[in-house]
Amino acid sequence: MPIYQLALPRSVLPRCRAVRYSRLLHSARCYSQDSQPKPGNTILQQLRKKLEPFCNSTKDKLEQTCAQVRYSSMQLRYHLEKARASVQEANKKLVQQEREGENSMLTFNDDLENKSKIVDLPSERERKRRQWSRKLEFYIDSLQETIFTATKALNDVTGYSSIEKLRKSIDMMETQLQETKRKLMQLREAHSDAVAVRNQSQRQVNELLQRKHMWSPGDLESFTRLYKEDADNVRRQEEANASLKAMEAKEEELSNSLHRAILTRYHEEQIWSDKIRRTSTWGTFILMGLNILLFLVVQLLLEPWKRRRLTNSFEDKVKRALEDHSLQHNLVLDRLSDRISEKIDAEMVHGIAPVPLPERTEQPEQPPAATTSGQPLGLREALASVGAAIAAEFGFFQAWIADHVRAIGGPTLSALQGFSGWPVLHIDLYNTVIFTCGMLLGLLVSH
């Protein structure tokens, strides 16, 4: 019996069983309802299955890129800290060297006449120059290791460090191959010597066997000794042969490995160069895009703003110039009117009447307007003469501008003749001389 039934009273047990049965029935119904696949869920699952490999590969590449960026930033920070420490160490060494080289007997620089310090002594200038040279030397010595490590970090980022390791492996394999070839030559010589010694011993044995019926006790001892030596020579020859075969196999294996390593290095360098070339190409495209963007920004935004600003400033300057010119002109007219009025007042004070103007009988004149302002007649006549002179000068200037515009706008022979005042013959001669000079200049340039 389960424990939970023992912990409950008997009146509660049927009710608990009914609740459990209803829960199981409800879960079975839900399972039966959920077990039927819906078409929308099926399409989503298929799409998820298709996109899952791409998402996983993209996620892996993103993680690798982030890891590489973090590693590169850590390396850069490490090298910057190392460079800063190297510079500080160089400064400490320089200060220590200066303290050691100082001489207390050669430090007098008091100017007793002016009660100040003497500056720019030759020794001080030389010390400053040497200080800069020594500082540069210390900096170069201290930064040499940093530059080396920075170059190594750059190779790690670009992937050339592996190629460097492969190149070192190839160098080591070449050295091993040379050593193996040298040992192989020695083993071949030893094998040749062993074969020669065995052949000689066999020749001696054969000679003894040919006169076997004529052996003496010395020949028997010689045969026994030669037979033992022949067994030793056979063993030495077999050992030399085995060593030679093993060395030849090793030499062949090293040659094959070296050949494969060289091919691998060539292939990896090609991939690395393609990667660098692709990176430089993308960098060039990015720089070109930035230049085009800057050009568009300058041409579409800055240039119109600059042109509008220049136009506004030019208009303001022209307005100010016209206002200044009108102000000066008004001042001149005011001065002139003041002088004329002073002269007329002086003449009236001395009792001198103004000279009457001669009347014109050819053309009837309109009656003069009444002097309501109380101005004398001489002032009005002077102002009228000044206005007429200004109008005449302005008309002459306007006619001169119109002649120039007409001559530029319609460059005909009659217009040029009327503008320059030359006869037609002179204009033709002038054109002929200009054409001849142009032809001569073109011939000289072409030859």
UniProtKB/Swiss-Prot annotation:
* Major location (coarse): mitochondrion
Lineage, top-rank taxon, reads Eukaryota
Q: Which GO terms describe its cellular component?
A: mitochondrial inner membrane
**Residue ranges annotated as Mitochondrial intermembrane topological domain:** 303-381, 445-447
Name the keywords, alphabetized.
Coiled coil, Membrane, Mitochondrion, Mitochondrion inner membrane, Transit peptide, Transmembrane, Transmembrane helix
Membrane topology, as annotated: Multi-pass membrane protein
| Coiled-coil stretches noted in the UniProt entry, renumbered to this chain | 74-196
Topological domains (Mitochondrial matrix): residue ranges? Answer: 403-423
Compartment(s): Mitochondrion inner membrane
User: What biological-process terms (Gene Ontology) are attached?
Assistant: inner mitochondrial membrane organization
Q: Where are the transmembrane segments?
A: 282-302, 382-402, 424-444
Q: Name one Pfam family in it.
A: She9_MDM33
Hey, which family's this protein in? Answer: Belongs to the SHE9 family.
Described purpose of this protein according to its UniProt entry: Required for the maintenance of the structure of the mitochondrial inner membrane. Involved in mitochondrial morphology. Causes growth arrest when highly overexpressed.
What does the subunit section of this Swiss-Prot or TrEMBL entry state?
A: Homooligomer.
List the protein's name: Sensitive to high expression protein 9 homolog, mitochondrial
Q: Which organism is it from?
A: Eremothecium gossypii (strain ATCC 10895 / CBS 109.51 / FGSC 9923 / NRRL Y-1056)
Ranked from the top, the taxonomy reads:
Eukaryota, Fungi, Dikarya, Ascomycota, Saccharomycotina
